[in-house]
Amino acid sequence: MKINDLANHQKPRERMLNYGASHLSHAELLAILINTGRKGYSSLDIANELLKSIVNLKELKHLSINDLNKIKGVGLYKALTLKAAFELGERMHSGSVDDKIQINNPKDAADFMMGKMEHLTQEKFIALFLNSKNIIIKQKTIFMGTLNSAIVHPREIYSEAVKCASNAIIVLHNHPSGDTTPSLEDIKTTDRLRECGDILGIQLLDHVIIGDHTYLSMVEEGYFDI
C-alpha cells in the first residue's frame, strides 16, 4: 500500500504535525527520512524492512552507506540521507565535554558572546538556557532592535526554558554605543524576567550588557540579587 492510500491521520508526516515526533514509531520516523517508496512498497514498508535487518536501534549507527544501499528501495541518495541523520543523532548523543560550555560567572557569559555582539550596530537580546550544572543547552535570539520592556516577553523566554528543561537562564544584550550603563528599560526588563523566573522556579542568574570590549553584570553591580 502506498503512503498516499493511507488515511491522513495514519500518514507519518501528518501524524508528526498533529502529535509531534515523539508519538511516531521507529518505522514512521525512518519512513519520513526515506521519503518515497518503490513499486509496490511504501516508504513505511521499506522502513520496516530496514528495521528487520537489525537487532536494535543502536545498530543503525553501524550500518554503512553500502549496507543501507543494499536494502531494496533505499538506493544511494536515501542511503546518504539516512547515514547523515544517524551520524547527527550519534553526535548529539555523545557530544564530548569539550563541546559543552559551562557558565560559572558573568565573565564566562560575556566571553562566550562578546565576539558575536560587541560590534553589532543594533541591539540584540539573547537568552542562554543552562542545565543544573550551568552548561549551556540552548541559545536563542529573542529580538533585534531597541530594547523595550514591552517587547521582551517573559512568556517567550520561559516557555523555551520549559521546553528544553532548563534550570536557569542568563540574558545578554549589547549597547551599540559601547557604554554598558543600564537604561531604565534594561532595569524594567530585568525585573520582569526575574519575577517571572521566581514564580516558575527557573532562576534568572544575570543580565549581562555587552559594550565595546567590556561588559556589565547587573548582579555584580547590585541591580538584583540571586
From Swiss-Prot:
The keyword Hydrolase applies. It holds the Pfam family UPF0758_N. One of its GO terms (biological process) is proteolysis. SUPFAM superfamilies: RuvA domain 2-like. Keywords: Hydrolase, Metal-binding, Metalloprotease, Protease, Zinc. Zn(2+) binds at H173, H175, D186. This is UPF0758 protein SSP1105. Belongs to the UPF0758 family. Signal peptide: none annotated. A motif (JAMM motif) lies at residues 173-186. GO terms for molecular function: metal ion binding; metallopeptidase activity. Residues 102-224 form the MPN domain. InterPro entries: MPN, RadC_JAB, RuvA_2-like, UPF0758, UPF0758_CS, UPF0758_N. The lineage of its organism: Bacteria, Bacillati, Bacillota, Bacilli, Bacillales.
